[in-house]
């Protein structure tokens, strides 16, 4: 209601636990088929969910610290993995941090000089690029941007409400 996108409120632990269980069941069936022996399957929703967090657990293991969420790739630490407001108070999202997508967009925007920032690690180093993208996307409406991005090799999507997403 406040005009900002929200998390989709997906039951993530249920989903990851279910996918882990499915994989375990299929492997157990294959083992039974090949060896005639069964398996005991013990699935933890917590463990299943933790296995899906490789993008945010790097600091925990590599640097022995808690992640700074706003600096992490999956939470907007990269300018090219963020959500931006448009002129009509709608939103667009970029989802490709690979250099080719950054190069394509920044070249089309006439700012290839920002590529060095785009390919730098996530975090505050991305702030100047985020500011540029924020200012750029706020110049036009969502409809304009959807048309502008058509047939461009850039990971872009409009942020839709649930009704729009189903239609």
What is each of the regions a protein language model found here?
Residues 80-158, 164:
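Aromatic-enriched alpha-helical interface/lid elements that frame and gate functional surfaces
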Residues 30, 57-58, 106-110, 167:
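A generic structural signal for secondary-structure junctions
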Residues 1, 59-70, 135-148, 166-167:
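Short, Lys/Arg-enriched charge-dense amphipathic segments
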Residues 1-96:
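Active-site-adjacent "lid/gating" segments in soluble enzymes
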Residues 47, 163-166:
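Residue-level detector of flexible, active-site-proximal loop/helix-junction positions
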